[in-house]
């Protein structure tokens, strides 16, 4: 009986030690000036879901998109994904990420409202687009 209790105690300590070695998820905030409308949010979320499963080893835990501020907060595991990989994923989806511009081919495929303001995209006067219209 003493050996059994000792074995359980050892397993608990070993389990605690192994859990302590796992990297914790961290947050990063990335500005994207052409991420202002709900359509853009849907396009980016679809892309990130596919990208997370295929190329990022499921390193993205969650993301929150603030359309009014034009930014995305991403929680990720740093042992699987780097901030540069996240910015590259945004660029490949057609969106600017901080100071890095989107890939031109991908930028051409996003909806017109998701284009940069200098290209005529984004919210128009008296036509807010940060809220999905009621259908």
Feature names for model-found ranges:
Residues 1-25:
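Bacterial Sec-dependent N-terminal signal peptides
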Residues 41-88:
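N-terminal, post-signal-peptide region of Sec/Tat-exported proteins
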Residues 107-133:
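Short, low-order "capping/linker" segments at domain edges
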